[in-house]
Amino acid sequence: RSHCDWSSDVCSSDLITRNKKLAKTSKTPGRTRAINIFTIDDQNLNRIADLPGYGFARVSKQTQREWAKLITAYLNSRQSLRGLVIIMDIRHPFKESDLTLIDWCSETNTPLLIVLNKSDKLSKSGVLREVEKANLMLKQMNLKGQALGFSSTKTTGIEKLDEKLKRWFDV
């Protein structure tokens, strides 16, 4: 889930259904205020949940705490959860809220995909370095997961993200 605008990067880029209007987006981080569910197939079997991005949002600490409770309750109730995508700004990865979600994945043995967004803001070597650091962290924590660089503006990483999501959704 997002700390870096999941709505714009995943849903409106729409890597699975190719529907450009799947989610409304905002230029301001933290506009997602509730859990939004998007059905991505005709059989109504596969869904993506867009969770409030409390790690990067300009909201009060109280609101951040409320979102953290909402997200934790939601994730704990999802029997059919196939994996968790955490989108982070590659220049500011692993905020406290990111680490909380990563710990949750570790505790629940949930597959994890870390999308290091805005990779167009770094050099290729900088992107590789950040992706390697994230993958090393996942390995040290014995997590089922991987990290990848991503840029919605340059379309970098779209194929890898699409491939991973399709595997999770068995499509």
Name what the model sees in each region.
Residues 121-171:
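Canonical P-loop GTPase G-domain recognition
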Residues 50:
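Conserved active-site aspartate in kinases
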Residues 17-44:
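Switch I (effector-binding) loop of TRAFAC-class P-loop GTPase G-domains
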Residues 35-39, 45, 69-77:
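Conserved alpha-helical scaffold flanking the Walker A/P-loop in AAA+ ATPase domains
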